[in-house]
Amino acid sequence: MINIHEIFQPQENIIHFVIAHKMNFKILLRFLLSVSIEISAQSYSISGHIRDLKSGKLLDGTVVLLKNNLYTISNTLGYYSLKDFPKGSYSVRISRLGYKSLSTTVLIDKESVKQDFVLESSPIELDEVLVNSSRTSKYLRNSPYSELLIDKTQIESQSSLSLSDVLKEQPGLSLSRDGIWGTEINIRGLSRENLVTLIDGNRIATSTDVAARLSMIDLDDVERIEVIKGASSSIYGSGATGGIINVITKTPRFNENFILQGGFSSGLNSVNKLFSSSGSIAGGNSFWSSKISGSFRKAGNTQTPSGELKNSQFKDFSLSAAVNFIPLENNLLKFNYQLFKAEDVGIPGASVFPSDAEVRYPDEKREMISAGYEIQNISKVFYKVSAKYSYQVIDRNVENLPHITQNVAATDTTEAIRAAVLKITPSSIHKNNNLQFQTDIILGKNNNLILGLDYWERNYHGIREKFQKIETLASDGSVFNTTIKVVGEKPLPDSKYKSLGFFAQDDAALFDEILFFTLGVRVEKIFVSGESTLNPLYEIANGKINYTPKGQKVIWNKIKADEISDSWNLGLKYSCTENLDLTLSIGYSFRSPSLEERFQYIDQGSYVRLGDPTLKAEKGKSADLGFRYYTSDFKLISSIFYNRFKDLVAEIPGTFEGKHAFVKTNIGKAQLYGFDLHSEFNFLNNYTFHITASYVKGDDITAKGNLPGIPPLNGNAGIKFTLVDYLVADISSTIFAQQNNTATGEMKTPGYSYFNLSCASTYNKFGLIEFQAAGGIENIFNKDYRNHLSTSRGFIKSEPGRNIFLKLNLKW
């Protein structure tokens, strides 16, 4: 569990950073409360319910937008409420995924107006939903960026094991494996350190060598996932050169009267005998709201068409809680807690280990607490002021059984020796502090400016122990002496990475909302420090410890470095007609090398991976040109993109102390370019054809070769249709071309295709309970294939085989 005393240790956290600048949270709270006093008396309100036009079902998650910044989201009872604004005539826009948006005018001429709305379902997703991935709310259709939204309804009907499984079918996104549980996402040829991953706006900062950050999230607690492809959002700073993944968890919503609700979900997968279950309880009234939820999953080894994938089992569970209060009108106070823990997680494929090694996470944990305060409707100019703090601990422990035995022949002066490496146990703790301030300012009609300051830091502490059994052999081969030795090493020095950034972004709609304009800038100061590090750190021989073992030396000197970087982005969306939009986004981005890239020293028996403290920051320039076409029965979203990088960080082959090594190096110039598209066509009644396609080419300009980790041309196509009322089926095929444009050391990958079938009902009411059932078959014909990105990382040569899945979701 999080130790509250750790949060307030001197020099270790953001609290002391704030105190050092003569501020504390009491002063902050007083400031926020004083600002709230300036809010003019605006006692008018509107409330009501949102329903489905055909069934009359109450619709949750519906956005009701009263004006540019004043909006709310309906709760699970379909209830919405907007308060404290002047009387007058307002344009109201109501939108929800899976429905046609509704725009109307409402006259607010009395203190409390009751107004219900009905929405008509749509077979085509028209992107009339709000997204917040650029730190400000805007309709997805109006975003100039290549942006994606995946909501909870899509997650509820899938068999996904991790966040990467949810995202892999989206255009421009591909899955990369270090295992079945441990996965990563590749966005247009960039992944891991080039992507910023957020949960509720808080960075998940940890090592990406053996993937885990996207696996430590309870999917049943996810409200939606927002993805920006490419370096279009500079306001997140270092690391966003490839894109942003922002996971928003479910938030308890307020209600005019007290409510108590619950939910339960359970699922089965045949391919690995997965059993999953989760539950939640939420309640509240007009003053407070809260929720608590938890999940449990257990899976055995995964079956592939070529046999069982050994050491691919896992078990995990999660717990989360949230409490929200409205202490004053237009004020909101939020608290959140999240715990995710995994045990006995097999890692069958990571490339840092020998091919016959047995590697697992004995335990893996992510724990986070956060608090936020915001004030809305402050004045006609200052719309909102918000502050948020989070503290996150990621605890990673690896156990590697390398099965390495070395025999040393006897000489004239020494006996024969048989040395076996019994196990290697790297472990690390990553502590993250994050503090954010943001002000939303209305400069004019359809012109909003945000100003903000954020600080985040990652503190790393780790150790690696190597357990050896050394046997001295007699001339006849018998053992006459045995030594059990434990060697302690530091894979990285104890180190810190700190970032302090100021950001600003202006969003404007011009010429009667024909042109949408976005300009964002960020200036960032980065501090990196590492302690002097000895290797070996110590040796223990038959229980006796030695802190000055033979061969001990300094592998990293104490280091402190800092740099100032800037980034910016410009986005335009032009509506040529009511149905046709053109978009353009350009940007300049940077990425300061991570702690692992600067200081890494991993020797797991197969080869050595080394960092370089003198690495330069990556700098990138990007451009994205988009074409979008919408009608009631057809949708086409497409983009072509180009990214050019300077001082790109990559691993190149080398040697270290006579061993084969991969060394982190600035390789010079590189470029990535390609396209992706997504289309839906409702060609007959409830039959909708959907297709995606993605292509990216990566060039190492300096070395005149190919970049590693580039997915081949790929896409999927399928038909979604209604079998009977409230039951929807989808049959699709995923297709990958061969990948022959490989980097040095990469395997070429043949092309393949496989087919999927899924069915999902809508929620149907039975008494007080609403239920939904989903099921399907993945990889119907048990196709044996290799994922190029998994092959380039490790030793998983065959992806999961045929999987029959079932899911049941209940709520009341």
Give, region by region, the residue ranges found by the protein language model.
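Short, acidic, small-residue-rich periplasmic hinge/interaction motif at the N-terminus
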Residues: 51, 62-64, 95-99, 109, ...
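Outer-membrane beta-barrel signature, preferentially recognizing the C-terminal barrel domain
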Residues: 352-378, 490-497, 554-567, 571, ...
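Transmembrane beta-barrel wall of Gram-negative outer-membrane proteins
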Residues: 45, 270-298, 308-344, 363-377, ...
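C-terminal beta-signal and adjacent terminal beta-strands/loops
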Residues: 644-647, 671, 726, 761-812
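N-terminal periplasmic accessory domains that precede
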Residues: 114-118, 163-166, 181-186, 198, ...
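Gram-negative outer-membrane beta-barrel transporters
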Residues: 510-515, 526, 641-645, 659-741
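Flexible loop and strand-edge segments within Gram-negative outer membrane beta-barrel domains
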Residues: 305-306, 310-312, 330-384, 391-415, ...
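Short acidic/polar hinge/loop motifs at secondary-structure boundaries
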Residues: 83, 175, 202-229, 660
